Amino acid sequence: MITFKSIALTIIFLSYFVSCVSSQRETKFLNHGFLGANLLNFGSSKVYPSGLLELTNTSMRQIGQAFHGFPIPLSNPNSTNSVSFSTSFIFAITQGTGAPGHGLAFVISPSMDFSGAFPSNYLGLFNTSNNGNSLNRILAIEFDTVQAVELNDIDDNHVGIDLNGVISIASAPAAYFDDREAKNISLRLASGKPVRVWIEYNATETMLNVTLAPLDRPKPSIPLLSRKMNLSGIFSQEHHVGFSASTGTVASSHFVLGWSFNIEGKESDFDITKLPSLPDPPPTLSPSPSPPVSTEKKSNNTMLIIIVAASATVALMILIFSGFWFLRRDKIFFIGGARKFSYQTISNATGGFDNSKLLGERNSGSFYKGQLAPTEIIAVKKITCTTRQQKTTLIAEIDAISKIKQRNLVNLHGYCSKGKDIYLVYEYVPNGSLDRFLFNNDRPVLTWSDRFCIIKGIAAALQHLHGEGQKPLIHGNVKASNVLLDEELNARLGDYGQGSRHSTTGHVAPELVNTGKVTRDTDVFAFGVLMMEIVCGRKAIEPTKAPEEISLVNWVLQGFKKGDLLMSCDTRINRENLVAREVLLVLKTGLLCANRSPESRPMMKNVFRYLEGTEALPHDDYLFYGV
């Protein structure tokens, strides 16, 4: 028998069921802060009691993500087209003690599972294997604060539209259009100040617009980015919407203060008074106001100040002359801003240079792994100088080396000197040297995507060292063992700027044998050979090969003349993922760099442009001459 109570319970259950279903199909929401919001947090992401969403803090190599609790239906069930949407959010990026990094992205993805994704430039969304894969079906709008040259970043403060990878299909320096002045005004993403973003997609016109402005400014009439694109192939099902941010060796805190989203309509506007506040910056101490000084005390205070100042001046002069005399005894001066470590600090960090800490030994010195602090791992290179002149020359270069900062170079933190030995303190790069990946079987086989990225990274590093309009810094020893790979397999060129040292057999330019002088041209020659080694997976000289294959350069040249350059490609590379156009580009560029005539070799800026596809290679006939 059906009772009133059973009917009531049924109605309550159906109401609850309908509310659950409708919440799962939610297509419009407005969040002033995220306390109690329908939000899923992953990684380092968290919500403050104030409602402020923090994706990452200033710790290194973090990934933080936050997604709306239920997927959003972005495909039109009545047609093959996707639906229109509009969203707006307010974010802020505050940098740590160093440079800001790496940025955040608004993400639309079919999945919230990003296991295997890399931090830093990959924003916690992709890795080197799946970057650019059309099966990802991911749209991301990136707000990038670190320039990755190998990913075609235009600068270290830009906004980009990313489709299935972190190489933007459209990007622009961060700015907003000022309607009163009728011009774009630059906007610093990592200023620590709130920035509002509007992202709108019109499915009918297949147009995606991205607009941004400071929080206290109205929405500009002209977007920063407008891209005509049909997203129906991407939004073929329900997708998750949210945010992803990451840090690398440089770090920032990434915050989101509010978020509005709507399908087939305009996003709701914010009430700025309801937004959570950002954390206070570290307090700066200001001196307390001095109490008034009586007239009677002024003369006594003045005399006291004179006496103290005179005493301090005398003491300072004594200290300066004592230090000068002490340094004169050794006739070696450490100049500039390079950090000097005590020998005890370096010894403690490496366990007294214990053999268990030994990373490797080369002609140029021995490398040790060390730990300065729980989170600061270092690599220490010990160089024993045979003459005073050698030590003086090396020390003179330390200051110049320490000032060089580029993401594809291994950073020099500082140095230590004791007796005949110099200890160079570098950042630790975890995956070791490139030669172990190319020539040994104890490491995974590098994919073609990895290799091409590594080649472009080395090119960017050499271009930076060689410089433009300034005195170049010659590497002098470009080879696979001097290229280190970080956690994301990015190339980090090391062992640069330490005197004139010749490359190993096979990498030595012909003129170097006669003159003994390293130049930009000899670096270019060595890099050309290294490019071929990376593609072919073998060393420049292999005496056990057939006579026509002993020299890698000659072997590649034979393939070029036969019209079959791909024959020399490393057979371990998965052919399904091989991009023949890129392989040919690298091998031809390598032959051009390995020209026997230094005048015929390109400069590194041209080499980099060849690899980026922004400058065409010379005609093929030109490559035959002089190789």
Curated annotation (Swiss-Prot):
Leader peptide range in chain numbering: 1-23
Region (Legume-lectin like): 26-262
GO molecular function, a single term: protein kinase activity
Binding annotation for ATP: 359-367, 381
Swiss-Prot/TrEMBL keywords: ATP-binding, Cell membrane, Glycoprotein, Lectin, Membrane, Nucleotide-binding, Receptor, Signal, Transmembrane, Transmembrane helix
Location of this chain's protein in the cell: Cell membrane
Membrane topology: Single-pass type I membrane protein
Entry note about domains: The protein kinase domain is predicted to be catalytically inactive.
Name of this protein: Probable inactive L-type lectin-domain containing receptor kinase III.1
Organism: Arabidopsis thaliana (Mouse-ear cress)
Lineage: Eukaryota, Viridiplantae, Streptophyta, Embryophyta, Tracheophyta
Name of the gene: LECRK31
